[in-house]
């Protein structure tokens, strides 16, 4: 970071209900938004014509608005479907990038749907067990430990 701080420097930006550290480079600062990784933030910055060496606090309001519109409407800016984190949605069949609070809502809806249709994954979630086929005989135990009493 340069020794002289510009007069319009923002130390904390508020983007999509998330506080972003203004001292970090813009590509890495955007990853603090839930649902945005390094690859997605990189392509969004390139589509918005923002210099990747800039700090997040150095951006103008117009540049921040441009970033937000591209992140919310990625398909309009020719970001490919395989790049998005919500593909062929169960309800409407659309491709989208789900971020921030809507990511939590979508995840909860998906789990509720799995539980409602009594799918194996939904039942494992309901019971609080491992879902992805891990062994559970010895690992992942929680709760009260039962010790072995010593023989007299």
From Swiss-Prot:
Stored Pfam families: Ribosomal_S13
The organism's place on the tree of life at top rank: Eukaryota
Family: Belongs to the universal ribosomal protein uS13 family.
Biological-process GO terms, alphabetical: translation
GO CC field: cytosol; small ribosomal subunit
Lineage of origin: Eukaryota, Metazoa, Chordata, Cephalochordata, Leptocardii
Places the protein is found: Cytoplasm
One MF term in the entry's GO annotations: structural constituent of ribosome
Source organism of the structure: Branchiostoma belcheri (Amphioxus)
HAMAP family: Ribosomal_uS13
Gene: RPS18
Role: Located at the top of the head of the 40S subunit, it contacts several helices of the 18S rRNA.
Keyword vocabulary terms for this entry: Cytoplasm, Ribonucleoprotein, Ribosomal protein, RNA-binding, rRNA-binding
Protein name in the entry: Small ribosomal subunit protein uS13
